[in-house]
Amino acid sequence: ILDIDILDEDQDIFGLDTKERETAMSSAKAPNLPASIFRAYDIRGVVGESLTTETAYWIGRAIGSESLAKGEPNVSVGRDGRLSGPELVQHLIQGLLDSGCDVSDIGMVPTPVLYYAANILAGKSGVMLTGSHNPPDYNGFKIVIAGDTLANEQIQVLRKRIESNDLSSGVGKVEQVDVLERYFQQIRGDIAMARPMKVVVDCGNGVAGVIAPQLIEALGCKVIPLYCEVDGNFPNHHPDPGKPENLVDLIAKVKSEKADLGLAFDGDGDRVGVVTNAGTMIYPDRLLMLFAKDVVSRNPGADIIFDVKCTRRLTPLISGYGGRPVMWKTGHSLIKKKMKESGALLAGEMSGHIFFKERWFGFDDGIYSAARLLEILSQDKRDAEQVFAAFPGDISTPEINITVTEESKFTIMDA
């Protein structure tokens, strides 16, 4: 559901009617966009500085042009709960329409719901306007074209289209589509809980709050919500469950409520963090051990992909379960591509992106992954602390981030 009425029948967001818009498009030329916003796995920048409404419009034109070139005239669009979202999404959609694409506007939803839309709707292209786990002044675009999540050179192709003015023109149509309810019901129908559980759900004021607590409750769990109101200021903690400091409140709540489990989601809901009943943070590579054991038990010989940041203990464990371990490059787009190539049924990254192909679609989905975890734990007589204690742990160095300027980071990487 959109907060702002994007278009009426006669005019676009610039106040132009159809004929005026066609004339304007034929003579319009894109400005020079900062190369720094075109990243390895997405397009991302600081709103009002490197990312403006004008930037969003031209990115929409480029995405639409590329989608049409791939034979996909329909594009789904979603956005997270950031304060800049309503205005930026208008210009993004207008750019897509002016490329000649039709747009299915699915409103304010988690990123996995956008991926879901790109799988179940007529069009297999989609754009998610999201800043993910970044600070409130950021926003960006995660892009699927013709079923492929863009990365690396594919993202640079969009930049080159804009710079060379290699952009299609047309007049598309937009319609609002409710995909969230369908996503909710499909997960609800897929998950079979053996017993109810008491779960603390921390959405970090991110967009997962529109569905995660309600879904987990619908699965039969008692939910204690924590920061589930969508607020683009992220007033309580940074929406990144990969950082232990962001789980302090969740751990305290799990202990005080004597809950069976704590779940935390990042800003756009494509990653999940896990805390046991004892307050132990479960790192994603250990979570993947449990998921791999479960998936391989039904699918002997299945490929299980993990990124290079994960523990080396995954290789012998997956082999011991009867699966085939595959180490791969870090990056959600790269993992999804590898899954398609190999036919893998499960993949995971140390960042908390978990990808299920068994019973699901193969995209990273923190909400579905949380539901699968609840299903597995509900079938075990042991508590979560005991279940994860059975898997080996390592002493590992936390991720070390070196602060550099935005302008210098690419030069440093190329050196």
Range-by-range predicted roles:
Residues 124-138, 254-276, 281, 324-365:
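Glycine-rich phosphate-binding loop
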Residues 2-92, 98-99, 177-197:
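An N-terminal, well-structured beta->alpha segment
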Residues 103-112, 281-284, 306-307, 328:
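Active-site nucleophile and cofactor-binding loops and adjacent substrate-binding regions
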Residues 72-80, 104, 198-200, 302-308, ...:
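Short glycine-rich phosphate-binding loop at a beta-alpha junction
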Residues 139-257:
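Gly/Ser/Thr-enriched, mixed-charge loops and adjacent short helices
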Residues 69, 73-138, 185, 214-275:
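N-terminal small/polar loop signature for handling phosphorylated ligands or for N-terminal nucleophile
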Residues 299-415:
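Phosphate-binding and adjacent anionic-ligand microenvironments
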